[in-house]
């Protein structure tokens, strides 16, 4: 795994994949230590980017309130060390972290508590003097006010300095924050660049690919997957966002620290005043978008499917209940690839289908993405979500006319008479490929593009129910609560007595690997769908298969 994973290493004390969690998790571990009367040190390391997430400050606030021994190391790698400030702060950190200084400080503090008069005034004066001295040199007053002893900033590449500071502060019985400054990619030639150039290069290392034979089962290794020249859904979104902005002045784009990943770099450069990166704060991003929508602005929130989970309450209470037309472009829905189980967008269909008034869609290609986004901008009284994978968009013509699609409308891509496949998103092309192969075997397969996951096309469903005794649903999302569940529920109530097979992600956390590898293993590629159809054809029983 490219992230912390408890099952992989004893040194991964707790799993992680989403940002801003280390302080809260570390505090829980520290309190477990106290509850179990055990003796060890706990240190939570957090990056400066993760400090944009509210969860980090929730943890800091709680730790400061508890006031027990706990160390937070803030790794700040977005700023260089000024020689003057670095020297001053290093000296000051050595001073205030020195055990002798802290012992004298604590004894003097206790002594002032015994003063017969002016005890509180004296202590307040001492605290203000120390804070003023810190304020001249270090940015630590905020953490002091939250109940932490602040040390730093120090050079994180000066190993001797880091070790001596840790030795000095390890026995302090209160919460401590050590601020270290580092340079991202230091020592790696390709990353020793400045500003955005090196940041964009470093972003490539966010997804750590599986290593060696363990990542390539025999049934996968023999397959050669060729890269296609067509744009990705992320490329398409980048172009669409700019196209829409040129034609509509009331639109803005929002992302949560994923400008490059979502394809919003061109938009951010062409429309900087209409581009908002809210940081690792998805909940804030959704409520922020709701505020914009409440005043007539049309916000398009481009957020990874897995990260949008963090904003679920905000989607319901700040957006859907208030009938606000926020557009959610859910990037990396389905299999996210090498980032693994913490990043697969497997749950969005299930967790959005149950939100009242939410429209849930999935384009089969870039052109349909264009039409769905245009349609979303014409909905003024409810949220509209568009899910798409990290994959090729198959077809995209940015010169054609945008079409307004009827809400809840499906599209029959191929007529058939023996089996009906109801496919979601790019799975339509998998279904069409298999339909052609089955046609050569004498089995007629109908393929329906279910671009509207919610609301469903009830007229089309009724037509399918009346004409077919074998139906397959296929989606790149979890089966439980997914599109197939919606179809099976409707068919059951409508009295369907044939066979229904739901294909999707299983009720387990899917491990990492390339999208093609994982889809093959899960039976969601052409070979897997072909086998499902053949098994269904061989099974002569006309029974429910829910």
Where are these regions (language model features)?
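Glycine-/acidic-rich phosphate or pyrophosphate-binding loops and their flanking alpha/beta elements
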Residues: 164-167, 206-207, 232-247, 263-269, ...
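A short, small-residue-rich loop immediately preceding and capping a beta-strand
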Residues: 12-15, 38-53, 70-73, 251-254, ...
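Cofactor-binding active-site loop characterized by glycine-rich and histidine/acidic residues
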Residues: 1-66, 251, 255-256, 264-265
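Peripheral docking tails and interdomain loops at the edges
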Residues: 212-227, 337-339, 359, 478, ...
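Long, well-ordered, tryptophan-enriched scaffold segments
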Residues: 77-236
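A glycine-rich helix N-cap at a beta->alpha junction
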Residues: 65-79, 320-332
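Conserved thiamine diphosphate
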Residues: 3-6, 31, 35-41, 87-162, ...
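Non-catalytic terminal/interface segments that mediate subunit docking, oligomerization
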Residues: 182-308, 314-324, 402, 406, ...
